[in-house]
């Protein structure tokens, strides 16, 4: 199922061109949208389009989160598809990571894969690994695309399961996820590793220099960029969502988002050569 520029090539080209690792998250939480946007017939589309257009000069990738669209039912799904269409039509060089966190049986996973990779043709998805390899095989059939397995997430309670250790192997759950991925030599697979665990991030990067990491938790969740850049390596996407698109909730929201993205971009550029 080839014929398109694969995720890895798209990501590397964009990252090296901008000398940056910035992934702009799109989490259009309706309650936090500017009032001027809330009055729009399609507020999620308007908000995301304006954020995208204001930040496109600095974004290595975009990561729309499906939950903020699904809450509006069929209207939300239509708006999600329009946002994806806007990105693909106007910024085809920028990869799209659909943050959907799917994880289900083989026959169900096949339908998800067909929708996101076959129909929408987003470049990448976030998936849960906890139902095992058969839950991701349908996605791997789309070889030009990439999946990000949830590995060590940035939320405060992630340690309740992800840092539990298996007595028979000595590995934690998140380490087991990495071990299985490497054991079966899946090439078009990356890991979600939270910025809120810099020590574990550094170890995982040392052990997996060629895997692409999606790193949430920077900005609104408290992680500092200066702590991330020395340890994350170039094969990383450092995501900022609320810190960029909710920099203002006034009529200047898009301008402020662009300014915030530019500021992060410049900080990343100063460190990029040394990564």
Swiss-Prot record:
Answer whether the UniProt record assigns the keyword Lyase to this protein. yes
What pathway annotation does it carry?
Pyrimidine metabolism; UMP biosynthesis via de novo pathway; UMP from orotate: step 2/2
Molecular function (GO) terms for this protein are:
orotidine-5'-phosphate decarboxylase activity
Spell out the family assignment given in the record's similarity comment: Belongs to the OMP decarboxylase family. Type 2 subfamily.
Q: Which residues form the active site?
A: 101 (proton donor)
The protein's organism comes out as Leptospira interrogans serogroup Icterohaemorrhagiae serovar Lai (strain 56601)
Q: Where are the transmembrane segments?
A: none
User: Which superkingdom heads the taxonomic lineage of this protein's source?
Assistant: Bacteria
Q: Which Pfam families match?
A: OMPdecase
Alphabetically sorted, this entry's keywords are: Decarboxylase, Lyase, Pyrimidine biosynthesis
Its Enzyme Commission number(s) read 4.1.1.23
NCBIfam families recorded? pyrF_sub2
Give the protein's recorded name.
Answer: Orotidine 5'-phosphate decarboxylase
What GO terms in the biological process aspect are recorded for it?
'de novo' pyrimidine nucleobase biosynthetic process; 'de novo' UMP biosynthetic process
The family database entries (InterPro entries) matched by this protein are listed as: Aldolase_TIM, OMPdecase_type-2, OMPdeCOase_dom, RibuloseP-bd_barrel
The record's HAMAP family line, in alphabetical order, gives: OMPdecase_type2
Q: Which reaction does it catalyse?
A: orotidine 5'-phosphate + H(+) = UMP + CO2
State if Cell cycle is listed as a keyword: no
């Amino acid at each position: 199922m080839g014929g398109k520029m694969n995720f890895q090539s798209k990501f590397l080209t964009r990252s090296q061109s901008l000398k940056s690792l910035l992934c702009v998250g799109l989490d259009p939480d309706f309650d936090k949208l500017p009032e001027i946007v809330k009055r729009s017939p399609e507020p999620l589309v308007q908000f995301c389009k304006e954020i995208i257009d204001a930040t496109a000069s600095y974004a290595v990738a975009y990561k729309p989160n499906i939950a903020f669209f699904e809450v509006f039912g069929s209207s939300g799904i239509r708006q999600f598809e329009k946002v994806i269409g806007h990105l693909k039509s106007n910024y085809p060089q920028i990869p799209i990571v659909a943050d959907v966190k799917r994880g289900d049986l083989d026959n169900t996973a096949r339908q998800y894969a067909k929708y996101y990779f076959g129909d929408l043709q987003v470049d990448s998805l976030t998936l849960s690994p906890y139902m095992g390899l058969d839950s991701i095989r349908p996605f791997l059939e789309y070889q030009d695309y990439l999946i990000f397995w949830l590995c060590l997430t940035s939320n405060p309670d992630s340690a309740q399961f992800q840092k539990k250790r298996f007595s028979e192997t000595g590995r934690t759950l998140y380490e087991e996820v990495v071990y299985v991925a490497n054991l079966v030599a899946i090439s078009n697979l990356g890991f979600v590793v939270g910025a809120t665990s810099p020590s574990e991030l550094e170890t995982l990067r040392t052990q997996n220099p060629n895997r692409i990491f999606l790193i949430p938790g920077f900005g609104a969740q408290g992680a500092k960029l200066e702590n991330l850049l020395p340890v994350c390596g170039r094969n990383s996407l450092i995501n900022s969502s609320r810190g960029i698109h909710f920099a203002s909730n006034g009529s200047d929201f898009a301008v402020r988002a662009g300014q915030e993205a530019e500021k992060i971009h410049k900080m990343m550029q100063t460190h990029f050569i040394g990564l």
